[in-house]
Amino acid sequence: MSADGPIDLTIVVPLFNEEESLEPLCEQVEAALSGQGLTFEVVFVDDGSTDGSFEVLARLSGSYGWLRAVRFRRNYRKAAALALGFKEARGRLVATLDADLQDDPAEIPNLLVALEAEGGRDLVSGWKRKRRDPLTKTLPSKLFNLITSAVSGIRLHDFNCGLKLYRREVVEEALPYLYGELYRFLPAIAHWAGYRVAELPVTHHPRRFGRSKFGTRRLLNGLLDLLSITFVVRFMSTPMHLFGSLGLLSTMAGGAIGAYITNLWWQTGTIQNRHPLLMLAILLIIVGFQLFSTGLLGDMLASLHQRGGRTPPVRDRIGPAAAPREDPPADER
């Protein structure tokens, strides 16, 4: 049911050219949630579709009071659609669902139960255990999930499953990272921020209409994105830890080679055709100083970022929160 007051659940559905899927999807959502005693809404984000998707949504909105829809002027891709959907969401919980009918809305009640299990979780990610896709999608996906699990430190089988359930504070934490294709790493981002993440096997259906937007470059792009988000999240506040360590290793390696060349020259009076090795030593020392300088500059930028007032997310609180501080007028300082 929909409501004008507080909303329990918002379902964000990004879509691109899915006009044939929308009516059966709305029927499935209604059947799955209408008897759950929840106030809910579904926010469809049309990512610049060139078919009649938005017109179908406009027609369906007359039958489903919980339906809301927004449309981009052109295609900005899934991360932008999710970001807009998260900003539009009014629920205390936020679910995501793909519009191609491969995700089953009937799984959302199961995600709600899993979110409250074992003392409560903050994010429950679906796992397409029996995936209804060709090998050209499943094999690269398995490799991607294995590498992402190893790098991120959180063991999940299916980072890219479109069916997920978030508490609102996780959504707000994730918004700054919703660009490019980084939406695939939202469970890892939540885990790094200290939120409790769980996984739940969900039903996966074959695609009924249209064609997949999956491309062969997604595996390579995903691995590059993984390196990017790992640096941004883990070293945003301490870039010197990364660049300083690499710079120190490079400088030490160059210094060791330089010491060897110096000792050789001291003992024999010549470096014995070790000129390439000497050039390598000089290069390593220069690169080491450059990396160290990059880390120092990064620390200065991180300090400015921290002064902007952003603090790590709070999990629990005892007692009232402090009232926001207001700076006195300049003439009273």
Language model segments and positions:
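Residue-level detector of anion-binding/catalytic polar loops
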Residues: 39, 121, 196, 203, ...
